[in-house]
Amino acid sequence: MAPDVAWLLVLPLVFRPTLVTGITIQTAIKNFRTLHVDYPMVNYPKGFHGYCNGLMAYVRGKLQDWYCPKIHYVVHAPLEDIQKFCKYSESFCENYNEYCTLTQNSFPVTICTLVHQQAPTSCSYNSTLTNQRLYLLCSRKHDAEPIGIIGLY
């Protein structure tokens, strides 16, 4: 009976890293959908002083972080159009420890750039709307989901 009890104590230690990794990936997938895809594009009230200021207030609230990100990319296209590029990501980006890919198509993207470092409660952003290809981080090598945007091309 003692060996059975020992296995019950050891199994959570063996399986916990897998569960934590799975939860982290699921959170990254959800965050990509909610923080990097805005389709159709939302119009923020005038009090936000521009699209990026409204969006970044939302982003900081969702991340529950006072830190002002220096740059943030938002794609204005259906999620399905973006997802298909992570179905076969053959490249591994060692700097990010994730699979990555460059989209074949250009997408409408808003680049939110921090004007300058300010007090955490008063982040101010410039908006640049462009049409470019995306460098995506993907959740795995095949049949993956996008989990981040690491740049534009």
Swiss-Prot record:
Which Cys pairs does UniProt list as disulfide-bonded?
Answer: none
Query: Is the keyword DNA-binding in the record?
Result: no
Q: Which InterPro entries match?
A: RNaseA, RNaseA-like_dom_sf, RNaseA_domain
Task: Extract one GO molecular function annotation from the record.
Answer: nucleic acid binding
Q: What is its main location?
A: secreted
CDD domains the UniProt entry points to: RNase_A
Keywords for this protein = Secreted, Signal
- Its signal peptide is 1-22
Q: Could you state one GO cellular component term attached to this entry? A: extracellular region
| Domain of life, source organism | Eukaryota
Give its localization. Answer: Secreted
Which Pfam families does the record associate with it?
RnaseA
Kindly list any coiled-coil regions of this protein: none
Instruction: Show the PANTHER family listed in the entry.
Output: INACTIVE RIBONUCLEASE-LIKE PROTEIN 13-RELATED, RIBONUCLEASE
Reported function: Does not exhibit any ribonuclease activity.
The Swiss-Prot or TrEMBL record describes its family as follows: Belongs to the pancreatic ribonuclease family.
Protein name (Swiss-Prot/TrEMBL): Probable inactive ribonuclease-like protein 13
Lineage, please? Eukaryota, Metazoa, Chordata, Craniata, Vertebrata
